[in-house]
Amino acid sequence: MCKFRLVVSTLFLLALGACSTVQVGRDFDLSAFESRVQRGVTTQVQVRGWLGAPAGMGVAVDTGGERFDEWTYYYGVGQLPDMTDARLKVLQIKFDRNGVVRGYDWSGEGK
């Protein structure tokens, strides 16, 4: 998870160096997601309907050995030369083997 964020952040910063305004990924409304999602109820089909296809898909394994499908959504935008205005947000969602949301975490822009 941390490696993915590092890779996305690095790609974002490299892209910012290539032109004056750069957008990476597809923007999403975190507040709208949080108001809709219900752990143990919401399905992959519903999440895809709200947010579209994930930017990345993988597998996470917890300390007890349980495996989860993990979907990642990210969005970044920035403008040179003032890098202080660059924004990056990442949402990672974990699903159980039945495709139901078990949990999620995000970084970047909050509510």
Regions inferred by a protein language model and the residue ranges of each:
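Bacterial N-terminal signal peptides that target proteins for export
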Residues: 1-8
